[in-house]
């Protein structure tokens, strides 16, 4: 007869057999928690741990993580040692030589819901709560995450699924309550180089007396995110308490969302979406709205650029996405307005963190004639928020936004935000640049946003803050052969050469068309 064993009643000395001594290997595995064990380790044999197994690891601080196992077949580790990647080491808060305990994690029950989605079945709130909870706890490997995102993209998510996913993502993170209303916010769907309206919009709204706690992302696939650009002007890595202090002091902020962890699962999903190049409508809506709800927003304007090389390419796609945003947002209590904008070309002159920051400063310092498109875009978006927040009469928002720029109040509000976040600083400039000239006489007829953004990244953006591209011409500009078309800016000559070689192979990134003579 088989004898049942109560595992919970096992003596402590048995659990100690699953303990190894920690060694910091200094291996950067990005966001992956990875552990390293000898292939002949007695625990691997006893527990049946194989390469890439998912293992629950805990240390003396009582913190525990789920990590991926890599087996070592050399003498990198001594018998009785376990190596840890930087991510695993820091999450467990270990010291060299600490005892580390290893056990099998609990079964991943939410995978049954992922399998259901793979076969096209809809997921309910309980399914999504379980999946999102396991993602937040680090129980999903990248393979599991990829399966969930791919299935969600392949089988269109219903309104109910998108709404429930949004709520699940909000509920696993912090949710801010500012104790007052309205709390205004904005988001840009993206896909357009430049277009750095957020710092200007926040400054205008704060100058008008509205509260705007803006959390922004770093670049995912673009040459710059709002957080990257703002970081060239002031610190952005503030925790929730520091963010709250800034907002209570000056009325608004522009901080990196990753530091405040308001929708932590979203950052994990975005990392996988970037690798897979997947950006489904349902996931986009849940991503945006979960962060806005978690930040305490009550009124939201969404900038949706539409153009042949933008993220949203057709009016039909824009209408579909707009409908999803409006329905889900309204159902979750958000006062939301979508503004479709021109996505046929970059907004502003700079593409890259510091170059976009210089555009922002030009607008705020009443030099917007240098970037008129950015000035108009920012005042339209800010004007809509001013009207929604009842800081301006209906139909007068853009006028008031322009007035706040001209009289300097928006600039003073921006300065106050920068000082409250740690101090204003001037954006850097790149030591190397090269001007690309128009190859012929004519008119700028088309700009490929995607390939222009790729060139800016090859020049070093966003990792090199001063790198990127400055446009010297826009759609409709009359060009003479040899006239500056755009310039490349890089931190190193190697990156400059790399980007230039790419541009030389892509002469149609900015197309110069022959000017049609009137008959």
Curated annotation (Swiss-Prot):
EC number: 2.4.2.4
Enzyme class: transferase
SMART domains, alphabetized: PYNP_C (SM00941)
UniProt keyword terms in alphabetical order: Glycosyltransferase, Transferase
Domain of life, per lineage: Bacteria
Gene Ontology cellular component list: cytosol
Catalytic reactions on record: thymidine + phosphate = 2-deoxy-alpha-D-ribose 1-phosphate + thymine
InterPro entries in alphabetical order: Glycosyl_Trfase_fam3, Glycosyl_Trfase_fam3_N_dom, Glycosyl_Trfase_fam3_N_dom_sf, Nuc_phospho_transferase, PYNP-like_C_sf, PYNP_C, Pyrmidine_PPase_CS, Thym_Pase_Put
Family stated for the protein in its record: Belongs to the thymidine/pyrimidine-nucleoside phosphorylase family. Type 2 subfamily.
Protein's UniProt name: Putative thymidine phosphorylase
Biological source species: Maricaulis maris (strain MCS10)
Source organism phylogeny: Bacteria, Pseudomonadati, Pseudomonadota, Alphaproteobacteria, Maricaulales
